[in-house]
């Protein structure tokens, strides 16, 4: 396979717009994974720790593309947010990680919280295994409801 490419954009406007949804566009202005080009984008000018977290998020999408069946948006973004959250935590930015955890967005914030709940149940390796085998949450009747019952 071709290696991944990293492109740094001068501004959010220079990152390719792959989404037509305005909400998604607002969330993808600091980083983006472009599967067909095997390219990760990040906007220049942010602190190292933040750029590291953004690239970890995008790298999670690359990993999902190569190791997982096609997945629903909430699973894709929830898992990538979990990877990003772990990087932020490991770099010592607990207050930023807490803000990520509290994000009300049903795809990113709730997805992160559900992945953290699953990690508590099965560990990080167990979470990776589950993500590798899941297609989408709708096939689980409601994956979120299942986790709420745990």
Language model regions located:
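Auxiliary, metal-adjacent structural segments of Zn-dependent hydrolase domains
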Residues: 1-39, 44-45
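Post-HExxH zinc-binding segment in Zn-dependent metallohydrolases
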Residues: 68-108
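Pan-zinc metallopeptidase signature
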Residues: 102-150
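Active-site recognition of the HExxH zinc-binding catalytic motif
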Residues: 53-66, 77, 81
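Short pre-active-site segment immediately N-terminal to the catalytic Zn-binding motif
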Residues: 35-55, 69-71
């Amino acid at each position: 396979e071709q290696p991944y490419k990293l492109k740094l954009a001068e501004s959010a406007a220079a990152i390719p717009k792959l989404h037509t949804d305005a909400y998604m566009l607002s969330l993808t202005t600091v980083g983006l994974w472009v599967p067909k080009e095997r390219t990760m984008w990040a906007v220049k000018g942010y602190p190292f720790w933040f750029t590291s977290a953004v690239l970890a998020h995008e790298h999670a999408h690359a990993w999902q593309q190569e190791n997982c069946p096609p997945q629903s948006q909430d699973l894709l973004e929830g898992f990538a947010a979990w990877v990003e959250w772990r990087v932020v935590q490991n770099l010592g930015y607990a207050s930023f990680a807490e803000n990520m955890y509290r994000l009300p967005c049903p795809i990113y914030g709730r997805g992160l919280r559900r992945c953290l709940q699953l990690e508590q149940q099965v560990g990080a390796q167990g979470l990776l295994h589950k993500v590798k085998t899941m297609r989408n949450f709708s096939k689980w009747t409601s994956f979120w409801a299942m986790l709420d019952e745990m």
